[in-house]
Design a protein with these regions (language model features):
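Catalytic-core regions of core metabolic enzymes
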Residues: 1-683, 705, 710-714
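Short intrinsically disordered coil segments
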Residues: 573, 691-692
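Ser/Thr/Pro-rich low-complexity tandem-repeat tracts
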Residues: 683-689, 695-709
Length: 714
């Protein structure tokens, strides 16, 4: 695949070619050659179309050439609809003529990677093989199986069949396609180039992306971030989530971060919304194209059934939305409209008033949307079905729908309707005026959640100047300590010892109790390579003799033990994902960290605000805030550790993983008491130059991350 670092590439041959040849054109609707030939001929008013068939004089009433060499001109783009064994010969003929692009429909092309290399060497490009084709509404180009209607959604898909499903679902939902590209095997042109090209595509407002792999994920998500900055957000559908790679992970950090976790973090950093199913993708796409970016997570629920209101509130809360109490002014307004005893504090139950007067639906929605603490309203219940069950009410109900849409526009807020008649005239009228209407409350809530995510501001980035002098990354605990101390992370006072005399020297310089560690062993607890609570020199020497007898010679580390009360053991780690780049992790630590699986992960580096939010979203956050009379611990210092490690992993391509576990977080500081550093041997890794705006120093923040307690100062 061509390196995305060479972007932008000229993809004109695949977006608006001046001439097209379909090799393998056919009259048979069961063959690819038929669909690509009919599609190509639809654009004959814009470009020259050549059909090639070695055994037919005409196809679809159009004259055919027996081969490319017989054409009167060299086509800019050639679509390959021939058996795999014939592809190489057709491509060689095309390259000899000066063809600029090849669309590989055929699967199983012999030596496809070698063929792609020869195509690139000739100055041409290959899309595919195993592609379902492409379509561009702006340039009237269709070289794909299926039917397309023009519209604002671009689809880039690694699976042609799933891409076809999306096209069909979109058509049912009234969404047209601006561009469709089935990337197939990505032997040359990959998703990153195609996504980058969409930034300037006139008709595209929203992008749907299906990918199964992220081989150059940093470049890919960079392109997605630029799309979002251009006002064209992306909905990502992917599969996976396997933890197979965790079986070979050396650190807890590696075993706690799956590919799915990292993809989720990359999506947040790039402003991409990950969806789980094709139907969810189409639902959110319909909502976005109807509403745009005026949604938020603070939701008011309005309904004419207490049961439906309650279900909606539960589904919204489970979906990460907030259902806050309404303000006093809103409650007072509702009190003047609703029957006594009706729920007015969110959810709002109309308690029969809507049935008595349909305009109540619009009036109450206006009341709740006027509340500055509300971003979005969800209307659930019977509205939309009155006219279906009683046609005499149709006109009146449609008028109320108009008022609801006008309220959403005037308040510049989103209204989503859950209706029991999703295919009725009222639902259609609501959609037409920018108010989504769905038949299931979970779909309505999922849409609100997706729209809120797409309405968030894109996280900012800036450059990270790298330090001029970088000490090499070396394995072992002592080297890890020195690396961390060099970037401002405090560690317990310690001495390196290989002999009994050096152990005695350490005991004389440090304050007991002592900790003894075999510094070259990564997971010390499993190997009995760490001993705690050594009260004096005699106990320390005895422990050293016993440990050395079991484990052999090596770099042993004597540390002063952190004995502060009220500490919670946490983990802070960072690693370099092979495809998606550096990430940072924080979570509940200790030897049982994999059991609890309580972590937060983001792409590195992160600003302090993001680090603090990572800590706050942990399941153990209540434990950190103080539990059953215990004082709260210092999460600010914990977040500083997260920032420091995120900057370190981003700046050092020779660093594969770094982990602090446990980090003892007390009321007055966070102190790492063990660390693991794993170097990478890939000298070709690019330095990551991203840094968030609130970073203070040109290298790393040199604030001490040590607790304020005198007990842990050197």
């Amino acid at each position: 695949m061509t390196s995305p670092r060479d972007l932008p590439q000229d993809l004109h041959a695949f977006t608006d070619p001046t001439s097209v040849a379909v090799v393998g054109a056919s009259d048979n609707p069961a063959k690819w050659g038929y669909w690509l030939a009919t599609g190509a001929l639809e654009g004959a008013g814009r470009r020259t179309v050549h059909l090639v068939n070695r055994s037919a004089a005409t196809v679809l009433g159009t004259s055919c050439a027996p081969d490319l060499a017989s054409l009167p001109e060299a086509p800019e783009l050639v679509a390959l609809c021939v058996p795999a064994a014939q592809v190489g010969c057709v491509v060689e003929d095309g390259m000899a003529l000066g063809v600029r692009g090849f669309l590989g429909i055929t699967a199983g092309i012999p030596d496809e990677s070698g063929l792609a290399a020869r195509i690139r060497g000739a100055g041409a490009r290959l899309l595919g093989g195993n592609s379902l084709g492409l379509y561009d509404a702006d340039s009237h180009l269709r070289l794909a199986w299926g039917h397309f209607s023009p519209g604002p959604l671009a689809i880039v898909t690694q699976s042609g069949q799933l891409g076809s499903e999306l096209v069909i679902r979109c058509a049912r939902g009234g969404i047209g396609i601006s561009r469709f590209v089935s990337i197939g095997n990505q032997s040359d042109i990959g998703a990153t180039e195609l996504l980058a090209d969409l930034a300037t595509h006139r008709s595209t407002r929203l992008v749907a992306l299906y990918l199964e792999s992220f081989s150059d994920g940093e470049a890919l998500f960079g392109a997605l971030r630029r799309l979002r900055a251009a006002g064209k957000p992306t909905l990502l559908l992917t599969i996976g989530g396997s933890r197979a790679s965790a079986r070979v992970a050396r650190s807890h950090t590696g075993s706690l971060t799956s590919t799915t976790d990292v993809v989720e973090a990359a999506c947040r950093a790039a402003g991409v919304l990950r969806v789980r199913t094709p139907s969810e993708l189409v639902d959110v796409a319909r909502g976005y194209l109807a509403v745009g970016t005026r949604s938020g997570r603070r939701v008011a629920i309005v309904g004419d059934s207490g049961g439906q209101c309650g279900v909606a509130a539960d589904v919204a809360s489970a979906g990460g939305l907030s259902v806050p109490d309404l303000g006093a002014a809103a409650i007072a307004r509702l009190g003047s409209r609703l029957p006594a005893g009706a729920a007015r504090d969110n959810p709002v139950d109309l308690a029969g008033r809507g049935e008595a007067d349909l305009t109540t639906y619009a009036t109450v929605l206006d009341d709740v949307l006027a509340d500055p603490g509300i971003d979005t309203a969800v209307l659930t219940g019977y509205f939309g079905r009155y006219g279906t069950d009683n046609p005499a009410l149709t006109s009146h109900e449609l008028g109320v729908a108009d008022r609801i849409a006008a309220t959403a526009r005037s308040r510049d807020k989103t209204v989503v309707v859950h209706t029991m008649a999703p295919d009725g005239a009222v639902a259609e009228a609501l959609w037409r005026q920018g108010v989504p209407a769905t038949g299931r409350i979970e779909d309505a809530v999922r849409m609100v959640s997706g729209l809120a995510a797409l309405s968030c501001e894109l996280p900012g980035t800036t450059d990270l100047p790298l330090p001029a002098d970088e000490p090499p990354i070396r394995p072992g605990y002592w080297a890890a300590r020195e690396l961390l101390r060099s970037v401002g992370v405090a560690m317990p006072p310690a001495r390196l010892a290989r002999t009994p005399d050096q152990v005695r020297e350490a005991a004389s310089r440090l304050t007991p109790p002592f900790v003894l560690k075999a510094g070259w062993i990564e997971h010390k607890s499993e190997a009995d390579a760490v001993l705690l609570g050594l009260r004096d020199e005699e106990a320390l020497l005895a422990a050293f003799a016993s440990m050395r007898a079991r484990l052999g010679e090596g770099d042993y580390v004597v540390e002063r033990q952190d004995t502060r009360p009220g500490c919670v053991e946490m983990l802070v780690g960072a690693r370099r994902d092979r495809a998606l780049g550096p990430v940072v992790v924080v979570g509940l630590g200790g030897t049982e960290t994999e059991v609890w699986q309580d972590t937060a992960i983001e792409c590195a580096p992160v600003p302090s605000g993001t680090a603090e939010a990572m800590v706050a979203r942990l399941r153990c956050a209540p434990l950190l805030a103080g539990w059953r009379g215990r004082p709260p611990v210092d999460t600010v210092h914990l977040a500083r550790l997260v920032v420091a490690l995120s900057q370190l992993i981003a700046a050092r391509p020779d660093l594969a993983e770094i982990e602090l576990n446990p980090v003892r977080v007390g009321p007055h500081g966070a102190l790492p008491v063990d660390a693991l550093v794993i170097p990478t041997h890939d000298s070709q890794l690019r330095r990551d130059s991203r840094l968030h705006p609130d970073s203070q120093d040109s290298r790393f923040s040199q604030d001490s991350y040590a607790p304020d307690s005198e007990d842990v100062t050197a």
